[in-house]
Amino acid sequence: MKVLVTGFEPFGGEKGNPALEAIKGLPAEIHGAEVRWLEVPTVFHKSAQVLEEEMNRYQPDFVLCIGQAGGRTSLTPERVTINQDDACISDNEDNQPIDRPIRPDGASAYFSSLPIKAMVQAIKKEGLPASVSNTAGTFVCSHLMYQALYLVEKKSPYVKAGFMHIPYMMEQVVNRPTTPAMSLVDIRRGIEAAIGAIIEHGDQELKLVGGETH
């Protein structure tokens, strides 16, 4: 069994990206499954091209994309991604698509095919905060999640894919003391726990409360 984990390069003026820094330190094997990490550019469409090339080479069973969500207080597996780019800032190549479909021939939205509630449960068992998120945003994170699930639908139906957002790492908030952050060690532990749940449960979701009132 093989798991491909992606993380973005720094963007938005940040010197580092906890997604990339965390996955670099992942073990090569988790719960008996082979784990490979991949750096992707924080660029619309190019990020998907890099992912597709690696999926073709590596032939993973699972794809877990990781992204930074500054301001979030917990690790948040994403439930859904919409077919819409609406960038509030430019990506790393100065692209800023506004109200643009990601794939004109794609579905209006795709749901994660990973066991997101099992992932949340596993992260919480490590003593770390986690919750299901119902919005992946409309920047490159959501773009890549959508593209991954589009590729799965069109070309690799045996693959299960999804996305998880993580908080800032502590180094990023030294001068922003009121901004939520988490140590890189804990972020990595949370990602490992999520991968463990993916391997254990596959696409068999747990029937747990994970919704919101608004």
UniProtKB/Swiss-Prot annotation:
Active site location: E78, C141, H165
Which Gene Ontology molecular function entries are recorded, alphabetically? Answer: pyroglutamyl-peptidase activity
Subunit and interaction comment? Homotetramer.
In the UniProt record, the gene name given for this protein reads pcp2
Reported function: Removes 5-oxoproline from various penultimate amino acid residues except L-proline.
Matching Gene3D superfamilies: Peptidase C15, pyroglutamyl peptidase I-like (3.40.630.20)
Matching NCBIfam families: PRK13197.1, pyro_pdase
Q: Which Gene Ontology CC terms are recorded?
A: cytosol
What highest taxon heads this organism's lineage? Bacteria
EC numbers for this chain: 3.4.19.3
Top EC class for this record: hydrolase
Name the source organism: Streptococcus pneumoniae serotype 4 (strain ATCC BAA-334 / TIGR4)
GO annotation, biological process: proteolysis
Keyword Signal among UniProt keywords? no
InterPro entries, from UniProt? Answer: Peptidase_C15, Peptidase_C15-like, Peptidase_C15-like_sf, PGP-I_bact-type, PGPEP1_Cys_AS
Q: Where in the cell is it found?
A: Cytoplasm
Which PROSITE patterns does the UniProt entry name for this protein? PYRASE_CYS
Q: What is this protein called in UniProt?
A: Pyrrolidone-carboxylate peptidase 2
What are the protein's UniProt keywords?
Answer: Cytoplasm, Hydrolase, Protease, Thiol protease
Where, by residue number, does the polypeptide cross the bilayer? none
Q: Which Pfam families match?
A: Peptidase_C15 (PF01470)
Which family does the similarity line name?
Belongs to the peptidase C15 family.
Catalytic reactions on record? Release of an N-terminal pyroglutamyl group from a polypeptide, the second amino acid generally not being Pro
